Design a protein with these regions (language model features):
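Charged/polar interaction segments and conserved charged motifs
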Residues: 1-2, 127
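Short helix-capping and inter-helix turn/linker motifs at the boundaries of alpha-helical repeat units
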Residues: 12-16, 58, 123
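Boundary/linker elements of alpha-helical solenoid repeat scaffolds
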Residues: 2-7, 47-51
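Short alpha-helical hairpin
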Residues: 5-22
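Long, amphipathic, Lys/Arg-enriched alpha-helical "connector/arm" segment
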Residues: 115-133
């Protein structure tokens, strides 16, 4: 991975707009969430570098959807693809809120549908609930 995709350490004078936005976004989180979102953003930055894109400026919804497709082509399950996009979508959302980009390219990006297996959901029926109360 080249230095263009490095998110940390914090060196504002030598960081790109995308790196500063990533550090700003990640500063909101701690622990496992910070670690997970850092990983997700490193993956996004690496994909952008391989694709010749800036990871923040000039990104369009089509780029985000191509990335989503590439995650599926790597063999990730639909639920994992959706999970991998949490950090990336948050990154764009906060970059837009902070005025770094004029629009959020990920807001309308189509994610895979994830079906919950209702048969595995445990719950009480009406009579069990009445007895419980």
């Amino acid at each position: 991975m080249s230095t263009t995709t490095t998110l940390l350490p914090f060196q504002p004078a030598s960081m790109s707009t995308a790196q500063l936005a990533a550090v700003s976004f990640l500063a909101r989180y701690s622990g496992r969430t910070h670690h997970l979102y850092s990983f997700q953003l490193r993956e996004w930055f690496a994909w952008c570098e391989r694709s010749g894109l800036d990871p923040l400026v000039g990104v369009q919804r089509a780029h985000v959807e191509l990335y989503i497709r590439s995650l599926g082509e790597r063999g990730l399950m639909d639920s994992s693809v959706v999970s991998m996009m949490n950090g990336v979508r948050g990154f764009f959302r906060f970059a837009h809120i902070d005025g770094v980009i004029p629009a959020d390219p990920a807001v309308y990006a189509r994610l895979p549908k994830v079906q919950r297996d209702e048969s595995r959901t445990q719950g009480l029926d009406r009579l069990e609930l009445i007895r419980f109360l």
